[in-house]
Amino acid sequence: MTNIRKTHPLMKIINDAFIDLPTPSNISSWWNFGSLLGLCLIMQILTGLFLAMHYTPDTTTAFSSITHICRDVNYGWIIRYLHANGASMFFICLYAHMGRGLYYGSHAFQETWNIGVILLFTVMATAFVGYVLPWGQMSFWGATVITNLLSAIPYVGNTLVEWIWGGFSVDKATLTRFFAFHFILPFIILALAIVHLLFLHETGSNNPTGIPSDMDKIPFHPYYTIKDILGALLLILALLMLTLFAPDLLGDPDNYTPANPLSTPAHIKPEWYFLFAYAILRSIPNKLGGVLALLLSILILAFIPMLHTSKQRSMMFRPFSQFLFWMLVADLLTLTWIGGQPVEHPYVIVGQFASILYFLLILVLMPVASLIENKLMKW
């Protein structure tokens, strides 16, 4: 008798995706982040659902409802902090996952990569609208500053901003619609993640060498299920350490002050995971130019497959490209640091240099290094 998991219409899908899936035998721990992202997403949806049961999306009560969750709801404080720090964990996993894809040439799977870029945009949008919900000072001013960027669009800009606001400033209508977006977007992310996986399973996983591994596949279960469980335990450990020992480490103290349209915080800045893009935005002394640079800093990922000039897929055997990759990582860390600093003398120029280097590395230096490596290999 054939096993039910191979015949039942629903179980067959699960079986083909997580049990009998042929997987390369040599994928490293960098391949763990996909499953960790799935775990983060489920965790965020569940904690978010429980928070939504007690939250009120209204300018007069939003801030108080967060206080109510933390003080009066059973274990509300841990749900709230798991959700807030879970977002940070989500982005850590996301950036590691993308870095892995860039390093090992996963962008060769173009559909999977493109869905991934769309997923990144959706996750960033979700995190942004979610940050507005507590209705603290940084929530309010962050929403004002970022939505205002759309006014840089010629001709329709101002109309567009007021349409998004639902009025002439960030107010009740804005908060209500942002809550609606924040509720629906994670389910869109979930659907996109399934499509992402669907396209990945059409081709099979890449591996560190970048060489086809059809002749050396092993079943996903038990080998990688156990490996994923280890990764999940480490992620949960890190999240619990952060949530229970330093819940406000990554947050902004300004957000513990209720939103006040009459008082601007000294330094308006987004959460840490957006600081690199914020630094690029600020480094251009022109509104439209800054907005375009900001958009392009993320959208550039969609062009990575076209910028791949090497005859090899992975960077595993390409020392020049490896050096430039780690230079890009260092550059992004520099941009993240600059994004959190005030707009003053040393920071401005460092941010401008780092922004130029970011685009230069991706658009010029890495493709040229790949061509040089091809020549050295006499290809």
UniProtKB/Swiss-Prot annotation:
Annotated residues for binding of a ubiquinone: H201
Location of the protein in the cell: Mitochondrion inner membrane
Binding site for heme b b566: H97, H196
Membrane-spanning intervals of the chain: 33-53, 77-98, 113-133, 178-198, 226-246, 288-308, 320-340, 347-367
GO molecular function: metal ion binding; ubiquinol-cytochrome-c reductase activity
Keywords: Electron transport, Heme, Iron, Membrane, Metal-binding, Mitochondrion, Mitochondrion inner membrane, Respiratory chain, Transmembrane, Transmembrane helix, Transport, Ubiquinone
Coiled-coil segments: none
UniProt-listed InterPro entries: Cyt_b/b6_C (IPR005798), Cyt_b/b6_C_sf (IPR036150), Cyt_b/b6_N (IPR005797), Cytb/b6-like_sf (IPR027387), Cytochrome_b (IPR030689), Cytochrome_b_C_euk/bac (IPR048260), Cytochrome_b_N_euk/bac (IPR048259), Di-haem_cyt_TM (IPR016174)
Function statement: Component of the ubiquinol-cytochrome c reductase complex (complex III or cytochrome b-c1 complex) that is part of the mitochondrial respiratory chain. The b-c1 complex mediates electron transfer from ubiquinol to cytochrome c. Contributes to the generation of a proton gradient across the mitochondrial membrane that is then used for ATP synthesis.
Name of protein: Cytochrome b
Organism: Balaena mysticetus
